Amino acid sequence: MSTQNNQSIRSSCDRCRSHKLKCTVAPENTRSGSSRCTRCIRAQVTCVFGHRSQSKRSTNVKKADLRSGTNGQETTSMQASTIVPGSPDLWVGRQEVEEGLHIGSDSGPSMADGDLWAELGTNHDLSLFDITPSSLPTHNSQQQFSATDFCSAPMAPHSALSTINSQEWQLDLSEYPNQTTTGPHAIVQLSALVAKIHETSRTLEESFWTSLAESNQLKSYPIGRVLSLSQDFSTILECIWASKNMDCKQSLSCAASDNHGQDATSSFELEDVLDYGELLSTVGTSPGRSDFSTSTHSSVATTVDMPTMLLVLSCYTSLTKLYSLVFEHFESHLSHLPHSYTSQTAHASPKWGLGLQLGELPSADETCTKVYTAVQILLDAFQSVEDVVGLPRSLSAVRQQSCGKEEEGESGDVFNRASLWTDFLAKSVFKATVKSSSEEDCEEIRQLSIKVKSLKSLIRERMKL
């Protein structure tokens, strides 16, 4: 315990420290060992010095290290913010923070001046320092602090932001219904489909179906695998177009809302930048109509990214080559079939009478019938693929056979809405695979159409249709 006459606030007695005052110990009391301050003697109360550790800094260091009022207020705010409101240490923390504050010389006499306290009488002591009970450290001090006591302790930044912006940062998952339920990405699905198509082609090329000696072996031909690949391709494309069509509509609605209210003179015209007729002539397309076979999904093709569109065209090319291989096997087998049923039906025709019924007719070659049915099923599936892909009619292996002037005239308005970007991209990709010297574009891709025509002619010839 310090025996100096002038005590600091930290080393003052409990009564003086509660009033935030420095106490002065009388010299005669120091020598006698009673250690009572002058204010407690005048007030005739017990002077109690609590267990407070004396500051290690000397009096001279304290006077030299006194801070300005602004720095003291910042220190008070920083230290008060670390104290939890309502904790028992709040009173001690505020006292220790205010120890570094001082009153300037121009604000009046010093609080530690002994003459000031000597002039004060006993009767005026308690009335002069009467304070509200809310600022006294009592056992229920947690309920007595007012809101103004914590004005120097600002709210932590993270808690303030979490309170204010807690609702703003919550995502509305209802706007994205398919984000958590969708399967693999379209690029992953298309890549796996390309691998399956190439594996099926390799299996058919290396199998015994390339050289069929008996007609019974054709019964086990795996047309189901080829049909399944076509159906899977159509399903994947439908999902791609549906998602891209939704994104395209959302982007168009956003663009329309952004451009609403703007001056019409600020928007640019397409003909000022690019001549559309000149662009059509560069890709070999007349301005009158587009070369597309269908416009169901071609208008959405411009929103599909380049890797996805290249995989789509790669799947279509691989599937086309697979169909050509299958039809080549069918044609090779039908060309070696004997004409056994022709003579039978010719000799049996005189025996047919008036009561002949349809069920009594002898059936034609069962192999030709099944091959014809298989060709029709496969072509229907492939035509569905072409419809979903939205390729030009010149690249279609099925639709270009039924292309006529009447159909073109009836659906000219539909063709005009097709996508030039898909037309140009498809021809650019397919030209890279052309090996012949023909001037016509994509001659190799049209080999499937040639196979289909040749196979149909052979079936009609064998069945005498």
Swiss-Prot record:
Segments carrying the region annotation (Disordered) are: 58-88
- The organism's superkingdom is given as Eukaryota
- List the signal peptide residues: none
- Polar residues compositional bias, start-end: 68-84
Q: Please name the InterPro entries in this protein's record.
A: Carb_Metab_Trans_Reg, Zn2-C6_fun-type_DNA-bd_sf, Zn2Cys6_DnaBD
- Provide the GO MF annotations for this entry: DNA binding; DNA-binding transcription factor activity, RNA polymerase II-specific; zinc ion binding
Q: Where in the cell is it found?
A: Nucleus
Observed phenotype of the null mutant? Impairs the transcription of the fusarisetin A biosynthesis cluster and abolishes fusarisetin A production.
- Does the entry feature the keyword DNA-binding, yes or no? yes
Residue numbers of the DNA-binding region are 13-47
Return the Gene3D superfamilies for the record. Zn(2)-C6 fungal-type DNA-binding domain
Name of the protein this chain belongs to: Fusarisetin A cluster transcription factor fsa5
Q: Which organism is it from?
A: Fusarium sp. (strain FN080326)
Q: Which gene encodes it?
A: fsa5
